[in-house]
Amino acid sequence: AIEQKKTEKVQIEKDKNLKETSLEKLKLKEQQLSAQLKEDERKKQELKRKVDVAIREEINKAKQREINRQKEKQRKKEEAKKGKSTQNTKTKNVKNDVAVNTKKVVTAESSEGSATGKNFANNKGRLPWPVNNGQITERYGRNSHPTLPGVSTVNNGIDITCSSGSKVRAVFEGEVSSVFSIPGSGKVVIIKHGGYMTVYSNLQEVYVSQGSKVSLKQSVGSLVNEGGVSSCHFEIHLISNGLPETLNPSLWLGGR
């Protein structure tokens, strides 16, 4: 009986040590997850900051282009008026024709962006995915952490987990507005489509440069390899009244 009690006591101590070890491992894992979450959040905030800066720079450039266009329009208008008062009828007619033709060209160029934006808007719910395959693993807006209770993150776009090194493609025709890198998060491409902009990040390689014209489904880069898989981060922004606004990409994407 004494030996049995000794054996039971030893077993109890073993069970206690095992529980303590398991608890320590669990705490360590939680600490590691928390540290990883903080690092991921830091990368997200850096991405948000750089995307916001890039989009606002593009907005300011567009405003300046419009100011310059209006100035040029006014200058030509004043030149045409001056020509009417100093030249004969034939010369005046020639100058009027030139002024009218120039005006048509400027109007066509200035309306190109708005036409592209309108076409983009008309394709809501029908845009192709930025990658050929994969599943959405983090949705737009607030997301609960899968393993840390009570912890959530906010996503300005969506994350699509797909095959390692997958190619990323433009969801609509447009012009590359920005290309930049974020340490630890790969490279980022921003494409403007009139009053809309799309963001593609976590790229290892980039196939386009700032100012490049891109077509529908054109490859813009390939994704970083993350342990045998890749994750494509994708955002859509609307420029409204000179300010950027994030949109839910899931409402805009259709078939592959």
Task: Name what the model sees in each region.
Residues E8, V168-E175, V208-S222:
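Short, well-structured beta-strand-loop connectors
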Residues L26, I136, I160, G174, ...:
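Terminal peptide-recognition signature
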Residues V189-K192, Q210-R256:
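Conserved, short, structured surface segments that act as functional micro-motifs
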Residues I67-N132, E138, R142:
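Long, low-complexity, acidic/serine-threonine-proline-glutamine-glycine-rich intrinsically disordered tracts
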Residues R139, V179-F180, L223:
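Residue-level recognition of beta-strand microenvironments
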Residues V105-K124, T137-A170, H193, S231, ...:
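Short glycine/threonine/proline-enriched tight-turn/helix- or strand-capping micro-motif at secondary-structure
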Residues A1-V94:
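Alpha-helical oligomerization segments with coiled-coil/rod-like character
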Residues T153, A170-E205:
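Zn2+-dependent peptidoglycan hydrolase active-site motif and core
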